[in-house]
């Protein structure tokens, strides 16, 4: 049975303790400031009061690599597109490899982040929804239909229910950053006078049990990393000579993990590692509200157009 896992938080880097001052292109002072064993670029306004910090590129030192948890090592490899660190020896291994291939053919959001916000790259285009669709597709210009971006992150998932049926509500570490990126692009495209606010989570539909084929297609995206199949990695805390072995989650474990027999209320939040894609921004059913002049106005809720890739439950 799948169990919850515990992961550590991030990693740090070190640099020498001597501040370095440079001149930016705009003539502003930039200083690499030693802080919490890391380095930051800082820009000041004309008064010198406002300080804008951004992390400089981080290079891990050998002594820091020894402190890295294997979960962090896995995440770094996947984030850089090295899916070979994950292996599935079961029958579903072919599906997993095909999914990794699909993600590899998309744009990496990890590589594009800095080119999308605050000013989007000049080659970014927005394809408006048509034929009853509700998604603004956002991506780099290509010869053909633009495609979205893939990403990976740690997050949580829980089963919930609405008037339209059951669904999974998903949150992950960078979701607010992604909301800023894609919300900003769409706001510029729509030339709206008001800020565009995005929903704080993403949702995917959970088919009913009587829709067997649709449900199986979703369940086959869930995998388990457990101690039994990764003994040396759990024992040493490092991924060295063999990749992580993942097993497809059984239907029984899936139903048990997400408390499918529970009638009222959502299931418990489950921690997981995920891969998925963002095609752009989608909108929902219009809402009606009243302004301070008692005028009726309508707005649409916006959220990331998320599609699931792979979900990995890591045994503690």
Curated annotation (Swiss-Prot):
Pfam families: Baculo_DNA_bind. Residues 1-34 are annotated as: Disordered. Residues 17-26 have a biased composition (Basic and acidic residues). InterPro entries: ssDNA-bd_baculovirus. This is Uncharacterized 36.6 kDa protein in EGT-IAP1 intergenic region. It comes from Autographa californica nuclear polyhedrosis virus.
């Amino acid at each position: 049975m799948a169990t919850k896992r515990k992961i550590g938080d991030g990693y740090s880097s070190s640099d020498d303790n001597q501040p370095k001052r440079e001149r930016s292109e705009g003539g502003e002072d930039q200083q690499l400031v030693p802080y919490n064993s890391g380095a930051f670029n800082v820009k000041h306004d004309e008064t010198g009061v406002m300080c804008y910090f951004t992390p400089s590129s981080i290079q891990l030192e050998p002594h820091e690599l020894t402190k890295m948890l294997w979960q962090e090592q896995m995440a770094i490899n996947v984030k850089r597109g090295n899916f070979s660190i994950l292996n599935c020896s079961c029958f579903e291994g072919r599906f997993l490899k095909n999914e990794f291939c699909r993600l590899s053919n998309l744009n990496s959001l990890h590589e594009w982040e800095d080119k999308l916000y605050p000013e989007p790259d000049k080659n970014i285009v927005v394809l408006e929804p048509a034929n009853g669709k509700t998604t603004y597709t956002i991506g780099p210009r290509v010869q053909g239909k633009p495609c979205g971006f893939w990403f990976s992150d740690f997050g949580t998932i829980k089963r919930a229910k609405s008037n339209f049926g059951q669904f999974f509500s998903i949150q992950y570490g960078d979701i607010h950053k992604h909301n800023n990126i894609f919300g900003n692009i769409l706001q510029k495209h729509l030339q709206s006078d008001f800020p565009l606010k995005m929903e704080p989570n993403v949702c995917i539909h959970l088919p009913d049990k009587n829709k067997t084929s649709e449900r199986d297609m979703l369940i086959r995206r869930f995998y388990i990393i457990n101690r039994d199949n990764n003994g040396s990695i759990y024992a040493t805390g490092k991924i060295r000579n063999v990749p992580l072995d993942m097993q497809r989650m059984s239907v029984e474990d899936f139903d048990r993990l997400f408390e499918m027999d529970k009638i009222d209320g959502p299931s418990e939040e489950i921690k997981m590692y995920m891969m998925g894609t963002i095609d752009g921004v989608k909108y929902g059913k219009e809402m009606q509200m009243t302004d301070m002049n008692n005028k009726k106005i309508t707005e649409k809720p916006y959220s990331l157009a998320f599609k699931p890739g792979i979900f990995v439950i890591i045994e503690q």
